[in-house]
């Protein structure tokens, strides 16, 4: 390991942040403007001052504090072991030992003391840079030799892909010069000139004389150590102009060059440090820039191949594999493809750091749980799941109908903030691994489930039973509250109430369709008050029930009427003769249902009829609509029963949480079921194909209702107010998410 920790105090968006326990691969994610690039600025500034460069000072996070600090704690365990070994007594080894380890004048700071306390067999070295208001700086270690040596042993390289010259790869030479510890002291300049003179001169002395003439004319400063490294390496290879797959760089696309540049740089970084004690740090800002998603995946895959090639483990050993610690590689990304591949391929050798903003505007950094032991999850972990790590708000649902509902464009137009939420249909395997409650990402979320995932009711025994999820939730709630927490007593009381439900009898009526006195709505409300802490919301009914209720019933009837009037076409290529024939066969007053069924069907196209046919068709439709409404109100006792019949017809459940299929299997509510069956076969035959999940009725009904309300109300606020009255559960979920998103947006822009 290269770095043990980085601490930043009162600089840029950082109030006081400590990053520690780095892995070989460190993937940084987060929304724009949360401080990801500020980490790069801080590290870059620290190293610039380490190398005595003049750079623009960093802004303070708050001017109430007169100073800012950057503290790097380096892991010197390996280098100390090397330089204290009897085998290594070279000049540079002695210099390292005398500079870093022999002196007792270097005091340990708090981070170093903590690090030593936690690992007595390890060696650490901390260096703090203090920035003052007058732009002056102070180092915790005065000796410039120490700082220079740290810059040599732990070099820093950064790549901002948006700003690199994709046709000039010379920065790679700088990298190469930083990754070795060659000794040039024994290289005699005159001997080198004589050697070359002997090898390349056509006549003895020609090369030497040529060099002498050049030196007599020009005046140059001596090569630095790094320049010597580059020149000696270039002499030994066939050329120093980079090509990509044998082609000149200018002939390649920007994306191809960017990918190859990064691959080459990281390949060299890993390869050249396997037998060196220099431990570099590299930071790549948005490596995905200019890359196709599949090429972005290949970038991580190829990095993993070279990483694995040299890695020595108990299972993998042999020539060419080393236990040498890898460089610390950081890359910040907005790419789900890169994040996905990092998590899947690097396992425990990676970590994901999630940057977000606190309410006060300072940067928060959370280490995400990004290692998974569940191979089922890793097998299905795709870009769809990875993109949730970048979400502003996540709504986890349990069905395609919910996806259709919450992604409805008409709704999103009325609630623009909600359009920023990710709606995700998650099974239990994915939900257990990807929800922010597990990953520890600072992403607000809610898990929406039906109440029947918690409880089950038997019409025969008139008793509830608690499902496993309820038992699990009770355990989680108990853990969430401390015994002395002021809210513990209230939650404990609610938990006891929930547990008592299964031992009490709840009478039903109307053949088990409704409860007699028990209110499922009240139970759901009480559950949601305490489950909110677990980011869970349980709907009193299903999505079908939330859409079809007593408040929405008038709109549902109007929607059915709209389907009849606008979507039903004449079921014959000769409409004039056909409609006359059907009129003669069926009496419009006493046989309107068979007449309607014979004449009309749901049509994809809307042919133009003669005015006479239009009038005849409209008369039949209106007669049928009047008959349908009268029949519905005569067949059922009240609107509560009408709503239930429609819910069940469209795949919903009774108040006692029975579907039509379950009622049939248990032999319950036979008369009620028979009524629904008759409606499906006769009066509502044209809707029967839509009475299934994802058939499209949710979208068409919701669009119709919003359009209808829009025509009734004067502004969006009144439209939203009416929607909240008609669909209270649905809109409360949307409003809660919107409020959270708007608050987050405000903190980012404020």
Swiss-Prot record:
Residues 1-173 are annotated as: ATPase domain N-terminus. It comes from the Bacteria. Changing residue 36 to A: No longer protects against SECphi6 infection. Residues 391-704 are annotated as: Toprim domain. One of its GO terms (molecular function) is nuclease activity. Signal peptide: none annotated. It is an enzyme of class 3 (hydrolase). Its cofactor is a divalent metal cation. Probably binds 2 metal cations. ATP binds at residues 33-37. Homodimer. Probable nuclease member of antiviral defense system retron Eco8, composed of an reverse transcriptase (RT), this nuclease and a non-coding RNA (ncRNA) encoded between them. Expression of retron Eco8 confers protection against bacteriophages T4, T6, T7 and SECphi4, SECphi6 and SECphi18. At multiplicity of infection (MOI) of 0.02 cultures slow growth when infected with SECphi4 but do not collapse, at MOI 2 cultures collapse. When the retron is cloned in another E.coli strain synthesizes msDNA (a branched RNA linked by a 2',5'-phosphodiester bond to a single-stranded DNA). This is Retron Eco8 OLD nuclease. The lineage of its organism: Bacteria, Pseudomonadati, Pseudomonadota, Gammaproteobacteria, Enterobacterales. The gene is old.
